[in-house]
Amino acid sequence: MGILAGVLTSLIGTAVGLIAGYKGGAVSEVLMRIVDVFLAIPSLAFTIVIASMLPKMTVTSTILVIGALNWMWMARSVRSQTLSESRRDYVDAAKALGMSDMEIMFKEILPNIIPVITANMVMVITQAMLTEASLSFLGIGDPSAISWGKMLSTAFDSGAIIYDCLLYTSRCV
């Protein structure tokens, strides 16, 4: 579940960052102000509020909520790398060849920023797993799904009598 939410987060953040970094100007300003607004709100609290408003938390809705609310840091780092790459000579050569903006972004710039995306994706997946465990621990996650947060909640509710579950699960998280 955390991996899928991390992949969704990475896709949204990469798309927003690529567009903001390549287009620049007013487009970049508007997108980055939206990112700033989302970053001003604590992500776990915002996730809890959105998740509690849904009628039923399923695995799909958990993935969508986590993925849709954690893309901002990825967008910022992709934008900064895209700004750097968009000023290189190969981008000017692609423009001279008549490539469209979408082709330049996805065929020329994106392959060169894959290392940044990969490094950020590792952090995003970790954050998504911790967010999902937090939601499950608080009882907001999918009740039918088995998760580390639910295991910790069960051990905690039993007064930590099941210390093996509490100890090993908390170490894994």
Predicted regions and their residues:
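Hydrophobic alpha-helical transmembrane segments of integral membrane proteins
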Residues: 38, 107, 162-163
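Glycine-rich helix-loop "coupling/hinge" segments at transmembrane-helix boundaries
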Residues: 52-53, 82, 131-165
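Transmembrane alpha-helices
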Residues: 1-12, 102-132
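Generic hydrophobic transmembrane alpha-helix motif, especially the helices
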Residues: 8, 12, 18-85, 92, ...
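Conserved small/polar residues in nucleotide/adenosyl-binding loops
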Residues: 168-173
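Hydrophobic alpha-helical segments embedded in the membrane of multi-pass proteins
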Residues: 70, 126-130, 147
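Residue-level preference for short helical/loop micro-motifs built around acidic side chains
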Residues: 84, 89-92, 103, 150
